[in-house]
Amino acid sequence: MEPHGHSGKSRKSTKFRSISRSLILCNAKTSDDGSSPDEKYPDPFETSLCQGKEGFFHSSMQLADTFEAGLSNIPDLALASDSAQLAAAGSDRGKHCRKMFFMKESSSTSSKEKSGKPEAQSSSFLFPKACHQRTRSNSTSVNPYSAGEIDFPMTKKSAAPTDRQPYSLCSNRKSLSQQLDYPILGTARPTRSLSTAQLGQLSGGLQASVISNIVLMKGQAKGLGFSIVGGKDSIYGPIGIYVKSIFAGGAAAADGRLQEGDEILELNGESMAGLTHQDALQKFKQAKKGLLTLTVRTRLTTPPSLCSHLSPPLCRSLSSSTCGAQDSSPFSLESPASPASTAKPNYRIMVEVSLKKEAGVGLGIGLCSIPYFQCISGIFVHTLSPGSVAHLDGRLRCGDEIVEINDSPVHCLTLNEVYTILSHCDPGPVPIIVSRHPDPQVSEQQLKEAVAQAVEGVKFGKDRHQWSLEGVKRLESSWHGRPTLEKEREKHSAPPHRRAQKIMVRSSSDSSYMSGSPGGSPCSAGAEPQPSEREGSTHSPSLSPGEEQEPCPGVPSRPQQESPPLPESLERESHPPLRLKKSFEILVRKPTSSKPKPPPRKYFKNDSEPQKKLEEKEKVTDPSGHTLPTCSQETRELLPLLLQEDTAGRAPCTAACCPGPAASTQTSSSTEGESRRSASPETPASPGKHPLLKRQARMDYSFDITAEDPWVRISDCIKNLFSPIMSENHSHTPLQPNTSLGEEDGTQGCPEGGLSKMDAANGAPRVYKSADGSTVKKGPPVAPKPAWFRQSLKGLRNRAPDPRRPPEVASAIQPTPVSRDPPGPQPQASSSIRQRISSFENFGSSQLPDRGVQRLSLQPSSGETTKFPGKQDGGRFSGLLGQGATVTAKHRQTEVESMSTTFPNSSEVRDPGLPESPPPGQRPSTKALSPDPLLRLLTTQSEDTQGPGLKMPSQRARSFPLTRTQSCETKLLDEKASKLYSISSQLSSAVMKSLLCLPSSVSCGQITCIPKERVSPKSPCNNSSAAEGFGEAMASDTGFSLNLSELREYSEGLTEPGETEDRNHCSSQAGQSVISLLSAEELEKLIEEVRVLDEATLKQLDSIHVTILHKEEGAGLGFSLAGGADLENKVITVHRVFPNGLASQEGTIQKGNEVLSINGKSLKGATHNDALAILRQARDPRQAVIVTRRTTVEATHDLNSSTDSAASASAASDISVESKEATVCTVTLEKTSAGLGFSLEGGKGSLHGDKPLTINRIFKGTEQGEMVQPGDEILQLAGTAVQGLTRFEAWNVIKALPDGPVTIVIRRTSLQCKQTTASADS
C-alpha cells in the first residue's frame, strides 16, 4: 500500500503540484487519481513527504496539532466502524488515500468520501502510507493525537491513526504542553501533584481545542479567581501554563468562559511560553488592576466536561475560544449535521489569501484544532473577529483549514505554534494558503460535525480506548511515534503495551522520515538505525526523535517495559502488512523496548540484582520484565540508572535529545509509564516517581533543588546504589567503616559477622555483597525521625553502646581516623565535598569511598584542636550545643557551661588515649562520614542496626546541610557588606556541616570532643547537670543562636574562657565550638577575612546572629520575609515571626531583622521570589541555619516608648548603655520648600509593625547629606518628640515647620556617629 502511494506520488507529483496551486478540485473517489493527487499533493511538501514519508511529515505536523486539539476522539467515532474493517480495507487504503486531493485536507476529504461510501475503504484509506501521510496531513493532526491519546481504541483502530502516528511523533515533539496532556491523560498513573494529574485529565490529548481571548477584571488586592499549574520547570518537563482550578466567586468563575485545563498562552499580549511556574505566578501578581486579556487554548471537551454537568463549561469554553457566541454554536454538539449532505464532501480546493497585517494589530483569525473526522483534521479557522483584517477581507471563511502561512507549511505544527506564527507575523502582506470544500457551507458543516464528534469521542474515548481491540490499538499506537508524555498516557490508559510499541514505532519511523521537518529531523537521523536501539531504549522514541537516538544508554530500562508488549507487537505484525515497512521496524523496536518499567523508587525493593535488571532491560522479550513488575523492574531501572548515570544513562540520553529538564523528565516518565502498562494497571503510578528518581539524585546533591523530599529520594537512590555499590565501597574504604561503624569495621575485620550482627540488631534484611555490587536492601530506607536528635542525645547519654561498638570497630576505625586526621587532605576534602555534593547525582561506588574519606578528613581538620576525628566530631557537637545555649539566651549560659563541663569529661575519657577514643572516635568518624549523603545513608542503616542512638535520621539531616554548604560560598559583595555576607555565609555553611555531624556525634556519645580551651574549671562542676540539661535541651531544643562577635574573639585568639566575663566565656566557647567544625582551610580563610575587617565592620558583627533551628522535615522556620531587589531594592528582612513557630520559640529572630543568609544561601541582592524560594527550601532539612543582622534601632526598640523629649533622651541614654553602638546626636538642618532633604520610614503602624521613625533615604543635592545618614532614628523635630507618631503624622510635623534652620535630635549607631558627630556639633 505504501509503495503504491509513493509511486503514485512520484508519478504525478509535478502535475498535481501545479493543479493544487491552481486550486483545482480533485475527485477523491478515483483511487488512481486520488492516490496520485494525494501523492502529488504531498509533493508540494515533497521535501518532507518524499519517500512515502510525506504522510509522516504531514502527520507529524498534524499530530502536533492534534495534540493540542485533542481530536482523537472524533477519529475514534468516525473510524469505529472502520476499525472493524481495517483488515479488509487494508488493501484498499492505498487507493482511497490517493483520493486525497492536495494535502492533509485532501487526504481527509478522501477519507470522508470513503467513510461516507465504504467505511472499510475509509479505514483502509487511513492505513496506506501515502494515504496515511495525507490522512496525517489532513487528519493526522487528529489521528495522531487520537491514536496517541484517548481515542486509541477507535482512532488507532482506523488506519488513519497509523498515518497520524508519524505526525503525533512530530506533534508531540513540537508541543510540550500537549505532551503534558498525554501523560496527564492517564489518571491511572499516579502523578506527582494533584494539579498535574488533574491537568492530565483535562488535557486529554485527543480533544479538539480552540484559541480565544478572555477578558477578566482584576480588582485591587484581588486575584483573577483561578490557580495555575505547569511551567518549564514542571516535573513532566517544560510545558505550558494551565488553569488548575477555578475558585467560586472569583472573576474567572463569574465570567464563565475560562475552564480548568485551559492553557494560558498570553497575558495582555505577553507570551507565557518558557516561563517557570514561579515566573508565571509573578506575572499575574504584577499585572495591574483592571482589565486583563488572557489568550487561552481551550479544549472543546475536557474529561470533566464529558459529564453532563460539565457540558456547560464546555460550551463556555467553546464560546470563549471562538471569542463570540457564534463560535459556540458552530461547535455545539447539537449543531453538527452530517456533512454528507453535500454530494462530494471530500473535495478540496486550495485557496491562497494575502492579508495585510498592520503593526500592533492582529489578523483577527480564530483558530481551532480538531481531531481526525472523515475528511476533517488539522487547524481550522473557526471564527473571524468582527472588524478585523481577515473579516474585512472576506476571503477567509469559517471551516477553512490552514495549510501554509508565509510559505511555511503548518501540518507539523501545533495549534499553539500556528497561533504564535499568526500573531507574530511582520507587518505587511501575510500569504495564507487554506484548504476548503468548494461549497463553504460544506466546510463549515464538516467543521461543526468534526467538533461534535470530537466532543463525543472524548466522552467515550477512554472507555473505547480501553475496550477497543488491543491489536488495532497497538498497530496504531506503534505507528504513532508519540513523545514520552503520550506514551505515558497510553501506558496509563488501558493499552500500555501497544502504546509503548506504537510510540516507539511512530517516533522512529516519523523521525527518520521527518528529518526534513523541524521536529522530525532528529528522529529521521536515528530512526532507521534506531530499530535496534529502540529495542534497547523504548523510552527514547517516546521522548522525541532526537531522544530516540540517544536512548540507547537507557535501553536497558526500556526493554523491560516494552518486553510485555512483544506479543502485542506480534499481533501488530499481523496487522502491519497493511502498514508501511516502517511500521514493522517500529513494531520490532517497540517490542524490544517495551519491557515494563520499575515501580516508584520510593517502593523500590531489591528483589533482583542489578545485573539481572540490566539483563532484563537488554532482553525485551525476557519474561522477567513481566514477572518483576515492581521490585525487579524498579531496581533494574534505579540501579542501572544510578550506575549508568555517569556513563550517559537514560538521563544523559534524554538530555542530549531534549535539552532541558523537561525532556529528561518526560523520557523517564514515559518509560516508566510504559513499563507500568506492561506490568499492571497499578504500575503506572511508578512512572512519575521513576523520572523523579533521576532528578532526585541530582537534586539531592544540590541543595538548591528541593522540590522533592531530598531525603526520601536520596534514601531510595542510595538504597539502590548502596546495595550494589555502597557495600563495595564500604568494604574497600575505611571511611565507610567509620561511617557505618559496626558495618564498616565488621565488613573489614569480619565482614560477615559484623554485618550479620548489625542486620540482626536492626532486624532489617541487609544483604551486602561488596563483590557483586548488587547488594539488595530489602528493607525500606530508614526514614528520618523527627525526634531523632533528642533521642540520639538521650540514648548516647544514658546508654553505654560505645564500649560495645569499640570492640567491633575499634581496630578498624582507629587507624582510619588517624590517617584521615592529617590537615593536608582536609582542604581538599572540603572542596571535594562540595564538588561531590553538586554531582551527587553521579555518585558511584568509587566516588563514595573518596567522599567518605574526604568527609572524615574534613571533620578532623575542622576540629584542629583535636587530632582524632572522633574527638573533633564530639567537640564540634558539644561546642555547637554549648554555643547554641550560650548565644540563644543568657539564661542558657549555665546550661552551656554545664554542657561544656560534661563534654570535657567525655573528651577527657577519649583524650586519655587512642584506644579509648577509638570507640567514640569510631562513632564520630562514622558520623563524620555521614555528611556525605551516600555514606550517611549507609551509616544510618548500620547505626540503626547498632542502636537507636545511632539512627540514620541525624545522618540524613547532616547530609542535607552539606548540599547547602556549596551555596554558602555564593556571593561576596561590596566592601563591608560583602565581607559581612561572606563571613556569614561561611559560618552558616560551616554550621550546617557541623550540624550534620553534630547529631550523629551526639547520638554516638562523642560529646566529649571539646577543645581543651573550652574546658573551664566551671565545666567540671556541671557535668551531670550539664549532661541532663543538654539532653533535655536537645530533646526540647528548637535551636540556638550565636553572635558573630564571639566567633571573632575566638578567631582573634581570644579563646581563653577565663579572660572575660561568664558571658564572654560562654560566647567564646560557642565560637570555638563552631570554629572547631570548620575545616583548616575554611577556618584560615575566615580568620583572614576577620583580620582584614576594619573596626567599624567588626562592631557590626555584634548585631549579626547565626541561629540554628532544629525542626521536623517539612516544617517551616516560623517567619516570613519582606523586601527584595525587585521591591524598591530593599534588603530582605523578617516580615513577621509567627507566634508558635520555631523562630518565635527560639527567640533570636525578630521582626525587622535583616536576613543575610539561610542555610548558607546568601540573600544579598536576591529578589523577593528568590528569597521565598530559599526560605521554602529550608523546609526539607532537619536543621536550618539563619544568619540575621539586628539593627540597633531594632535592638533598642523596646526602650523607645516615651513620647516627650526628655523621655526620649533618657531612653536614648539607656539604649546607649545597653548597646554601645547607639548614640544621640543633635543636628541642625535647613528646611526649604523641598523639605529637609530626606525621606522617612517606620513609625507607628508601619508595614513592619510599630517601628521608630528612621531616615530612609537622603535626597541628592541636599547639603545636609553629611549631617544625617540613612538609618538614623528621629527622636525630635524642632523640640517636638516624634516617638509614637505614624510616618504620615511625622511628615505633617515637618511640613508645618517654617523654612529655615531646624534642630533635629537623632539616634545613630556608633559606626555612623564618628562621621556625623563632628558635623553635627559644628
Swiss-Prot record:
GO terms for biological process: induction of positive chemotaxis; leukocyte chemotaxis; positive regulation of inflammatory response; positive regulation of interleukin-1 alpha production; positive regulation of interleukin-12 production; positive regulation of interleukin-6 production; regulation of calcium ion transport. This is Pro-interleukin-16. Synthesized as a chemo-attractant inactive precursor which is proteolytically cleaved by caspase-3 to yield IL-16. Its main location: secreted. Isoform 1 is expressed in neurons of the cerebellum and hippocampus. Isoform 2 is expressed in thymus, spleen and lung. It holds the Pfam family PDZ. Residues 480-493, 569-588, 604-621 have a biased composition (Basic and acidic residues). One of its GO terms (molecular function) is CD4 receptor binding. Residues 729-741, 856-865, 896-907 have a biased composition (Polar residues). It comes from Mus musculus. It comes from the Eukaryota. Residues 104-147, 480-633, 651-695, 729-963 are annotated as: Disordered. GO terms for cellular component: collagen-containing extracellular matrix; cytosol; extracellular space; Flemming body; focal adhesion; nuclear speck; plasma membrane. Residues 1099-1195 are annotated as: Interaction with PPP1R12A, PPP1R12B and PPP1R12C. Keywords: Chemotaxis, Cytokine, Cytoplasm, Nucleus, Phosphoprotein, Repeat, Secreted, Transcription, Transcription regulation. Interleukin-16 stimulates a migratory response in CD4+ lymphocytes, monocytes, and eosinophils. Primes CD4+ T-cells for IL-2 and IL-15 responsiveness. Also induces T-lymphocyte expression of interleukin 2 receptor. Ligand for CD4.
